[in-house]
Every structure is written in C-alpha cells, then in structure tokens.
C-alpha cells in the first residue's frame, strides 16, 4: 500500500525515500503528504547540487527558470522529483490540465521572458512581482475553489489565453465566460448560450497591465487590472440560481463596483451541485481509478465534503485518501500515467545522479505532454489518449537513455542479486513497480540476461542490468500508475 500511496499522492519514491517512508505508520504518511504546509520549501536550493537531478542551461547563460521556458520546465521537473511537498506539485499538475493555458500563444504577444513569468514566476525572484499561474495553482490548489477560480479569472496568462483583454461592454468576448462554466466548473449540459453571453458581460473590464521596468523584459511582469470603463454595469440574468435565495439575476451596479459581479457569479458556480460532482469525479479519476466507472457513493461523499466545507479542496482530498476505494488493491495501477508522472517515477526509481532534467524534455513532448503547453483549452487527452505508437517509442527511448546513464549505479545496487538471472529479474521487477508481468514476459527477461553465458561479472552486470531496466521501464505495464 505504501508504494501505491506514494505514486498517487506524489510521483513514486526513490529507494532511499521508500526506506524512510517505510518507517512510518500509513496514517502518518498520508497525513504528512496531505498537510504538506509543514514541510520545507527549500527544494530549489538543491538545484545544481551533483547529488540531485541535474539541469542544463543555455551555453554561457545562468539558470533562469523565471524568464526562460525550458529552464522553467526543468525546474518543475526538479520540484516533482525532489520536493518534500509532492502533493503540492501533483495538484499543480492536476490543475494545470484543468485550467489548461499554453505558453506559445502568450509568448507571441509579450515575448518569452514575460510569458515565462506569467506561466510560473517565483515572486521571490523579482521584488514585487506576481506569482505565475502554476505558482498560484500551488498556492491555492488545496484551498477554497472559489478563491482558486477568482485567481484564475484575474490571472494574466489566463486573461490573454482566452482573450479576456478584448472583453468590453461594447463588444463582449465570450471565451472565458463559456470556459469557466463548461471546463472549469459546471460542465457541459448545465448552462445555455444565454448564460454564456451573460457570463461574458460579468467579466468585462478584466484586463492586464505591465509593472516594473517596462523597458526591461527581465525586470517587468504583467498583473491583473480592472478597467471600470470597459465593464457592462447592467443586470445579468442566468438560467440557474446565482444567489442562495434562488435569484438568477446579478443586479445592475456602478461600473466601479463591477468586480462584485464576478464574485457573485463565481460563488454561484462553486456552490452549484454540478460543480461539486464534476470536481469530485475528476479527483476520483486522478487519484483512484480512471479505467472503471467512478464509485457513486464516494463521488457523493466527496461532493458533500466540498459543499459542507466552504468548497475546500483539501476537505475532499481528506475524505478521498481515507476511503476504502483509494486503498483497495483493485484500484492499484488503474490509471494511465501522464508523461510527467511517468518520467519522474522513472527518474526516482532508476536514479538521477548525473542525469539532467533537460534530457527528459524532448521525450516527454514525444510522449504527448510538454509542460506549460497543453494542446488547447480542453487540456490533454487523458487515459488511453496517452498510449500511442509514437508515445511507446518515446518511452522506450527514454528508458534506454536513463538506464544507460545510470548503469554503474544500477549495477552497484543489484550486486547482491548477481548470482543468477532469475534473482536479478526478481529484484528488478520489485524495484521498478508495475501492475505485474506474465510468466512469459518474465521468462523473456531471464532469457535476455542469458543471451550470453551468465557470469555476473561487473562489466556484464552493468550492461545487462541497464538493459533489463530498459525492458521494464519501457514496457507498457510501467505506464500504469
């Protein structure tokens, strides 16, 4: 169960991490992972330490994850690998798909430096600067969904991604008004085109502005700005309840008070039972099982926890992680790993000393996921969508690269099992956790080790253990989380 918990609430565990967690009772493990606010946030100070996952900078350039997108991707992969708050990064990844926002469109308008800051700026990197979108997902990802939704409505990256800066009272732009209902809260079938038009008018005037040294791309950033003159001050009527008394109309109010329209509307969305069940279902599929139909009783329990605790996401997670369904062995390996999850799990289980996060960037993209670059506002195609011929080839190539890089460390760790191919295969299958291999597959692995006379000598162990690792980590079975 421990390994299952570490895979689902984080990104699996290295052998050393697994040993440390094994010393704790299961309930303590879950509590520590869930209530991660008590854990250190010093993960970034380890960047550049040769004992951790490496990073690769542009030739002659310092590591600049707040202004260079490839460096930002490497930093996020580093955090997924080494953060003492793995659930924080896991939830950021979950919400990144939910509030799917792509870097390239934004960079085309403001340049790569400012676009990178919009996506994942660490505000400590530049005095007074705004947290990037992914940093906001870390900050608010397990708190009130109302707060999170309002933060996304005001987020500069989201504003440009869905053209909210063009949304004015004389020419309403419907993109955000539609997506906040269809994708971010209620779901399809729970709103009408009348609601879309009214929602667009709610957010008129939500815009952005540049702050800092405007002439310096490395010393400036974008932040939210409300433009009252662009706001539609008239009443907005919906087909569903906006207020607890059942009222469906946001009243007319002076444009200077127009942000209250958005607050009223967002509170209506988050308190709607359709939103509660939709978020509950998405969390269930992400943490429990996306292959079988969701358990209706647990979905109801999660939705009730949300509605009964001021729309708090952690309240849902607490119920979910305590549930029999989460711990049921029938739900182990019943999720398709997202490429980011697959890569980090492999790095943790195979090894990372001397390996660069940069070496995972192209393989991850070839597997179908480039961080900060979902294909569209719908996010990535999940589940079986991750399994394709090109994705399989990318996983096999990545597994070969990683295993080859770690061959000396792999051989050192496996030295106690070198007596026979059978023992080595047994060890490897227990270290690199999967849903299991058939007897035929296991025999094929043993035959691979015996392809030349087995001696267990150092050179042979290095070559064969790397090859065996490649076979397991590159196999389809390893994709399941």
Identify the function of each model-found stretch:
Residues 19-22, 33-34, 81, 137, ...:
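Hydrophobic residues in alpha-helical segments
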Residues 90-91, 146-147, 315-316, 465-468:
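Alpha-helical scaffolds flanking conserved acidic
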């Amino acid at each position: 169960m421990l390994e299952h918990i570490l895979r689902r609430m984080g990104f699996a565990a290295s052998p050393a991490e697994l040993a440390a967690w094994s010393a704790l009772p299961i309930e303590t493990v879950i509590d520590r992972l869930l209530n991660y606010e008590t854990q250190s946030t010093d993960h970034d100070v380890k960047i550049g330490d040769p004992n951790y996952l490496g990073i690769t900078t542009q030739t002659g350039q310092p590591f600049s994850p707040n202004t260079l997108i490839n460096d930002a991707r490497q930093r996020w992969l580093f955090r997924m690998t080494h953060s003492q708050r793995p659930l924080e990064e896991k939830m950021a990844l979950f919400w990144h798909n939910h509030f799917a926002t792509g870097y390239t469109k934004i960079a085309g308008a403001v340049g790569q430096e400012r676009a990178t800051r919009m996506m994942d700026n660490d505000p400590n990197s530049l005095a007074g600067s705004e947290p990037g979108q992914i940093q906001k997902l870390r900050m608010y990802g397990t708190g009130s969904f109302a707060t999170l939704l309002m933060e996304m409505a005001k987020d500069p990256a989201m504003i440009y991604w869905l053209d909210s800066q063009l949304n004015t009272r004389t020419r309403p732009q419907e993109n955000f008004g539609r997506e906040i209902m269809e994708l971010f809260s209620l779901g399809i079938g729970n709103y009408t085109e009348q609601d879309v038009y009214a929602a667009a008018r709610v957010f008129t005037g939500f815009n952005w502005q540049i702050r800092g040294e405007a002439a310096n791309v490395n010393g400036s950033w974008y932040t939210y700005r409300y433009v009252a003159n662009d706001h539609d001050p008239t009443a907005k009527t919906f087909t569903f309840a906006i207020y607890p008394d059942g009222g469906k109309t946001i009243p007319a109010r002076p444009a200077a008070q127009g942000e209250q329209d958005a607050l009223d509307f967002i509170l209506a969305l988050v308190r709607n039972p359709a939103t509660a069940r939709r978020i509950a279902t998405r969390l269930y599929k992400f943490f429990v099982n996306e292959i079988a139909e969701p358990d209706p009783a647990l979905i109801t329990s999660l939705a009730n926890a949300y509605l009964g605790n001021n729309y708090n996401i952690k309240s849902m997670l607490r119920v979910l992680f305590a549930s029999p369904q989460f711990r049921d062995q029938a739900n182990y390996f019943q999720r398709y790993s997202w490429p980011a999850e697959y890569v980090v799990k492999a790095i943790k289980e195979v090894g990372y000393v001397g390996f660069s996060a940069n070496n995972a960037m192209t393989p991850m993209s070839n597997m179908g996921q480039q961080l900060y670059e979902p294909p569209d506002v719908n996010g990535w195609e999940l589940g079986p969508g991750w399994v394709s011929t090109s994705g399989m080839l990318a996983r096999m190539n990545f597994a070969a690269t990683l295993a080859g890089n770690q061959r000396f460390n792999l051989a050192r760790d496996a030295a106690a099992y070198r007596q026979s191919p059978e023992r080595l295969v047994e060890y490897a299958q227990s270290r690199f956790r999967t849903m299991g291999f058939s007897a035929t597959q296991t025999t094929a692995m043993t035959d691979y080790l015996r392809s030349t006379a087995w001696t267990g000598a150092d050179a042979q162990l290095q070559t064969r253990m790397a090859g065996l690792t490649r076979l397991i980590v590159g196999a389809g079975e390893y994709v399941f989380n």
